[in-house]
């Protein structure tokens, strides 16, 4: 409840991360995102969440946290620059969780990180929390409805894939009616 949490990336996984973080009621949640449609989505559906562009993120987090950086960082974007941004925005002794997948290996610039004493956690979904997640959705504690921004009949599944793959029309998730 006293933490500042930074989520880098507001795609489907980032928004689901946001929904789970909101259950813990941290003092402040900041979402870093460059896509204006995703920023608009966050502001519309989660007005208490702060949003910031990547190029302004480090300064914004430092100014808007109690300890000179985020207490917890979730790196969900997976862009070439977001791994570095994640640890740079973290305060000393913070936890940085890397959910994103990268196309290339990331470098730990240890001299630059010296003194931060960060804890890194990595990994995607291992399935061990699926039962609890489904229970929270069923109980209405996690509302995933807003994430479904488009619906297509099964006969138009190729159109749905094209929309999602090309990130058109502010798509977050597509539901396919069977």
PLM features per residue range, with description:
Residues 1-55:
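Mid-domain Rossmann-like dinucleotide-binding core that forms the NAD(H)/NADP(H) cofactor-binding site
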Residues 1-4, 39-119:
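Glycine-rich cofactor phosphate-binding loops and adjacent beta1-alpha1 units
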Residues 11, 15, 36, 80, ...:
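Glycine-rich phosphate-binding loop at the start of an alpha helix
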Residues 84-88, 127-178:
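C-terminal hydrophobic helical "lid"/dimerization subdomain
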Residues 31, 75, 122:
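Conserved SAM-binding loop
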Residues 27, 69, 143-146:
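A local structural motif
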Residues 33, 100, 124:
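Conserved acidic E/D residue at the C-terminus of a beta-strand in Rossmann-like folds
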């Amino acid at each position: 409840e006293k933490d500042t949490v930074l989520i880098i990336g507001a795609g489907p996984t980032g928004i689901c991360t946001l929904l789970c973080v909101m259950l813990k009621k941290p003092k402040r949640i900041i979402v870093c995102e460059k896509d204006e449609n995703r920023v608009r989505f966050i502001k519309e559906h989660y007005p208490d969440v702060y949003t910031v562009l990547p190029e302004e993120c480090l300064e914004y987090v430092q100014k808007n946290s109690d300890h000179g950086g985020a207490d917890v960082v979730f790196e969900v974007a997976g862009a070439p620059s977001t791994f570095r941004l994640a640890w740079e925005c973290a305060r000393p002794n913070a936890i940085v969780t890397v959910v994103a997948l990268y196309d290339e290996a990331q470098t730990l610039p240890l001299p630059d990180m010296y003194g931060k004493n960060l804890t890194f956690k990595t990994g995607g979904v291992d399935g061990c929390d699926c039962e609890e997640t489904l229970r929270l959705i069923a109980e209405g504690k996690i509302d995933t409805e807003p994430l479904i921004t488009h619906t297509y009949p099964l006969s138009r599944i190729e159109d749905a894939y094209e929309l999602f793959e090309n990130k058109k029309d502010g798509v977050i998730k597509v539901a396919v009616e069977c």
